[in-house]
Design a protein with these regions (language model features):
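Core nucleic-acid recognition elements
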Residues: 1-277, 281-295, 303-310, 319-323, ...
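Short catalytic-loop micro-motif centered on adjacent basic/acidic residues
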Residues: 313-316, 366
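Repeat-solenoid scaffold signature
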Residues: 365-371
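Short, surface-exposed beta-edge/turn micro-motifs
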Residues: 252, 362-365
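Short, flexible, solvent-exposed loop/turn segments with mixed acidic/basic and small polar residues
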Residues: 352-363
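Short amphipathic beta-strand starts and helix->beta connectors
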Residues: 342-354
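A short, contiguous, amphipathic alpha-helix enriched in charged residues
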Residues: 331-343
Length: 371
């Protein structure tokens, strides 16, 4: 037997990986849209068969899919780069170059970098500036308006995720030439002019509805971006330096706040880590989240008040991977675990447990509050 179904309801699938061949693992990954490579699939099988000696639940497989995605783990940046002869050029670009440059500065005004939702530097004796930038390329290639809007929404929440108040947006946008011949566009891709108009509207829609201006950025056009648009969204915020804190401890409570949870954004992190193909829109359209800046404005006001009244011991946003990633990261920061009651999550529609767990519905934040 390769799997069985536990009917609670809803239906929960268990997979007996000891009965799975290598080809079966590939089929499982494709059918569930896990986007895991063979080494990752094999390590999961070995762990559950040899160490835990039990079946793996569908929710656990989807958790690995999100937590081990390129979007969340930065496997390319953290990997070993070799030349044509197999000689190591660099081990972990993120650590060796990106992080090392800031570590080398070793300045006292660096409050936080590469360990929280946004980087923070001191502005003066009382306030600090928080900055976050992030790409939202794949979602924007499928739905330029929604992809760009949720890209801006995501970095605004990252700023809120370090207790800062967002004050300005920035962006870098890269498209193919606007006069690129229509007949030369590869199947499954959209024309640069359509992408350009949708992305610009999406960014303006989200920022304007929250009263946050886009104050700087850049735009470029090159044939190299016909195959994959670049939407590099950023946000800047300000916070009293003394309010930047993380004091969570075991037995604190997790609170999910903001928008209701729906089916939009499911597989978003793993989709962002895969290649764009001819059928990407048909398969992954639901991976693009639905933007709601009015709801995020409510979040902003609530979070700043929670900060000022010192009501929470920790905060993070729900971005790539949804609850699966946010809860895991928060629990990891205190070297602990968490018990999550999925039936308490406020839903927009009926969802399976694994869908609730990895949904990337926007305008949601996770708080940790003292018991």
């Amino acid at each position: 037997m390769k799997y069985d179904v536990i009917t609670i309801p809803p239906d929960i699938y268990r997979f007996y990986l000891s009965n799975f061949t290598d080809d079966d693992l590939y089929s499982l990954s494709n059918n569930l849209r896990l986007n895991l490579n063979f080494n990752e699939l094999k390590s999961i099988r070995d762990y559950f068969v040899n160490k835990l000696n039990r079946a793996v639940f569908d929710l656990e497989l989807y958790s690995f899919s999100q937590l081990w995605s390129e979007h969340c783990r930065h496997k390319v940046f953290r990997g070993i780069i070799v030349d044509d002869n197999g000689n190591v050029i660099v081990d972990d670009i993120l650590k060796s170059y990106i992080a090392k440059a800031t570590e080398k500065c070793n300045k006292p005004w660096i409050v936080s970098f590469l360990k929280d939702n946004a980087g923070i530097i001191e502005f003066d004796d009382k306030y600090s500036i928080a900055v976050k930038v992030e790409t939202h390329n794949h979602p924007s290639a499928i739905d330029p308006f929604g992809g760009a809007a949720t890209g801006i929404g995501g970095v605004i929440r990252d700023i809120l995720g370090v207790w800062a108040s967002p004050i300005a947006c920035i962006d870098v946008l890269c498209f193919g030439p606007l006069n690129y011949p229509y007949e030369s566009i590869p199947k499954g891709l959209k024309h640069p002019k359509y992408l350009f108009r949708g992305v610009v509207k999406g960014i303006g829609f989200y920022g304007n509805n929250m009263g946050i201006p886009t104050v700087a950025g850049a735009i470029c056009f090159d044939e190299g971006y016909v195959g994959n648009v670049v939407v590099y969204a950023g946000c800047i915020g300000i916070l009293p330096t003394s309010t930047y804190r993380f004091s969570a401890k075991p037995r604190d409570k997790i609170v999910l706040m903001g928008n209701s949870t729906g089916r939009d954004g499911i597989h978003g992190a793993s989709f962002a880590s895969s290649d764009l193909k001819e059928d990407s829109e048909r398969i992954a359209r639901s991976a693009v989240q639905i933007p709601d800046p009015v709801e995020e404005e409510k979040l902003r006001r609530a979070i700043i008040r929670i900060r000022d009244e010192n009501l929470a011991s920790g905060i993070t946003d729900l971005g790539g991977g949804g609850l699966a990633v946010a809860v895991t990261e928060m629990a990891g920061r205190i070297n602990g675990g968490a018990r999550v009651f999925l039936d308490s999550v406020h839903l927009r529609e009926d969802l399976l447990p694994w869908e609730i767990w990895i949904s990337e519905s926007q305008e949601r934040m996770l708080l940790i509050v003292p018991e």
